[in-house]
């Protein structure tokens, strides 16, 4: 079986890893002192690979066997010390540690009335998305989780997530979208055609709010590129909130046909 092949490969390569990295028995602590550090075990005495060995096998399969150019892992921030070991293991088995990028995610605190809350007794200290979605609409959960970059802790406000006013950024953005759709539908029903960019008289664009909106729309493609390059999709959410704000200002200050 394929899993047995990878197991044998990792067991064989583990000797190379131990020879290269297993001699280090000291490590620096946060205060600059040294303490004993255990060698990383890849195969237990009973011959069963450890989770670390399975992780190495996964990356070997992804990069060497399936030919991906890069692996992007999403880990909890409490695994930050594992990053260097994984990159070192990849180097030891003939891969390249620099082909692994790791995004470290911080923990999420659920809040209600400004206080931490536990939603489920049956799941212990961990709260599943199933538990969360019993209280919060899925669109709110997706949007609010993705408003924060990976390195920031999240205080997820359950009260805010179910509001239907401008305090909830999900509602705020959806309201802008609904206004836009209403305008487009009205214009279509009245037979108003859209002029191409080459037919627009730019001298008529004089209101600050409409100029701000145009500038923001022009910046959107680059924002997508930046979000991809930095592995930070939260940039899109924050941009969309700013864009909705710019549209609401435009809507309030300019007369719009069909509105």
Where are these regions (language model features)?
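Non-catalytic interaction-recognition regions
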Residues: 1-259
């Amino acid at each position: 079986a394929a899993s047995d092949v990878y197991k044998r490969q990792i067991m064989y390569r583990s000797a190379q890893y131990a020879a290269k990295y297993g001699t280090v028995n000291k490590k620096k602590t946060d205060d600059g002192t040294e303490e004993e550090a255990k060698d990383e075990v890849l195969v237990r005495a009973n011959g069963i690979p450890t989770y670390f060995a399975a992780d190495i096998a996964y990356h070997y399969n992804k990069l060497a066997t399936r030919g991906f150019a890069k692996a992007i892992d999403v880990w909890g921030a409490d695994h930050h010390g594992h990053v260097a070991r994984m990159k070192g293991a990849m180097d030891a088995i003939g891969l390249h540690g620099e082909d692994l990028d790791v995004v470290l995610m911080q923990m999420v605190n659920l809040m209600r009335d400004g206080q931490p809350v536990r939603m489920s007794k049956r799941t212990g200290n961990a709260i599943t998305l199933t538990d969360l979605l019993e209280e919060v609409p899925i669109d709110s959960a997706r949007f609010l989780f993705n408003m924060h970059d990976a390195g920031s802790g999240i205080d997820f406000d359950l009260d805010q997530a179910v509001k239907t006013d401008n305090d909830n950024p999900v509602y705020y953005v959806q309201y802008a979208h609904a206004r836009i759709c209403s305008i487009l539908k009205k214009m279509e029903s009245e037979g108003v055609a859209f002029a191409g960019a080459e037919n627009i008289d730019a001298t008529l664009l004089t209101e600050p709010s409409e100029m701000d909106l145009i500038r923001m729309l022009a910046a959107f493609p680059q924002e997508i590129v930046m979000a991809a390059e930095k592995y930070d999709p939260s940039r899109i959410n924050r941009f969309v909130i700013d864009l909705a704000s710019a549209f609401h200002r435009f809507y309030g200050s300019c007369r719009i046909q069909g509105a």
